[in-house]
Amino acid sequence: MSRRNVAKKREVSADRKYNSKIVAKFINHVMKKGKRALAEKIVYGAMEKAEKQLGVPAMDVLTGVLANISPAVELRSFRAGGVNYRIPVPIKEERSRFIAFGWLLSEARKRKGMCSRDRIALELLEAHSGHGGAFRKFEENVKVAESGRAFSHFRFFNTGGARRSNPSNNIGGNR
């Protein structure tokens, strides 16, 4: 890790077809091994298929999906008293979108017997209507966050690691 400068956040340029940064981020998420043209073909095809089936513009489909499955909190593990707690921590919109894209693609990739375009389109349709694998993950996240809400005060503690005394002060070998 560099000690000098904090890495600057690079702006993502909007995609060609919908002129949207959200679609560009989704394409980047789908892309494997730098094959952007293939990822664009898959995403645009999936969005067009979802648009035809729902009769709603493709951008509205994607924004509706993100509204349905984007989490408001992230679960972070915290160890206290020998027990691991999963504590809900509020997150920014960009991180929320990133998690939603991950859920959407992981559930789409679990489907077998179809091409990627059809799998993503089907997952988009189901997430838009409020069911499907990605929506299930969202609901599970909400339930776990609700159950961990009692321990949410732990997020204000320093979780940077164990506290150790200075070893030079340990005269006589007391640990």
From Swiss-Prot:
One of its GO terms (cellular component) is small ribosomal subunit. GO terms for biological process: translation. InterPro entries: Ribosomal_uS7 (IPR000235), Ribosomal_uS7_bac/org-type (IPR005717), Ribosomal_uS7_CS (IPR020606), Ribosomal_uS7_dom (IPR023798), Ribosomal_uS7_dom_sf (IPR036823). Keywords: Ribonucleoprotein, Ribosomal protein, RNA-binding, rRNA-binding, tRNA-binding. It comes from Neorickettsia sennetsu (strain ATCC VR-367 / Miyayama) (Ehrlichia sennetsu). Pfam families: Ribosomal_S7 (PF00177). Transmembrane segments: none annotated. One of the primary rRNA binding proteins, it binds directly to 16S rRNA where it nucleates assembly of the head domain of the 30S subunit. Is located at the subunit interface close to the decoding center, probably blocks exit of the E-site tRNA. Coiled coil: none annotated. Part of the 30S ribosomal subunit. Contacts proteins S9 and S11. This is Small ribosomal subunit protein uS7. One of its GO terms (molecular function) is tRNA binding. Belongs to the universal ribosomal protein uS7 family. CDD domains: uS7_Bacteria. PROSITE patterns: RIBOSOMAL_S7.
